[in-house]
Amino acid sequence: SVHHQDSSDEPSESSHPCCDLCLCTKSIPPQCQCADIRLDSCHSACKSCMCTRSMPGQCRCLDTHDFCHKPCKSRDKD
């Protein structure tokens, strides 16, 4: 599989950090983690990405933030 790093302004699923299932603790500040599963890669802003060894790999970003990224599924497409 070929991975392209391009700096175009085209929004692509892999390059923009987004999260549909974001889990936060009730602490202040909250500790939020994205539980989304992506195939073969995590979004570009992810520092700690963990993937299964299956084909294709199921990847989760293990980063913790005090916020959630915007949802990946845009509401205006349907």
UniProtKB/Swiss-Prot annotation:
Gene Ontology molecular-function annotations: serine-type endopeptidase inhibitor activity
SMART domains: BowB (SM00269)
Pfam family, any one: Bowman-Birk_leg
Keywords of the record: Disulfide bond, Protease inhibitor, Serine protease inhibitor
CDD domains reported for this sequence: BBI
Disulfide cross-links: C18-C72, C19-C34, C22-C68, C24-C32, C42-C49, C46-C61, C51-C59
Record carries keyword rRNA-binding: no
Keyword Disulfide bond appears in the UniProt entry: yes
Top-level lineage group: Eukaryota
InterPro entries, per database record: Bowman-Birk_prot_inh, Prot_inh_BBI
Residues annotated as site: Reactive bond: K26, S27, R53, S54
GO cellular component, one term: extracellular region
Note: The I-A sequence is shown.
Function: These inhibitors strongly inhibit trypsin.
Family label: Belongs to the Bowman-Birk serine protease inhibitor family.
Protein name, per record: Bowman-Birk type proteinase inhibitors I-A, I-B, and I-A'
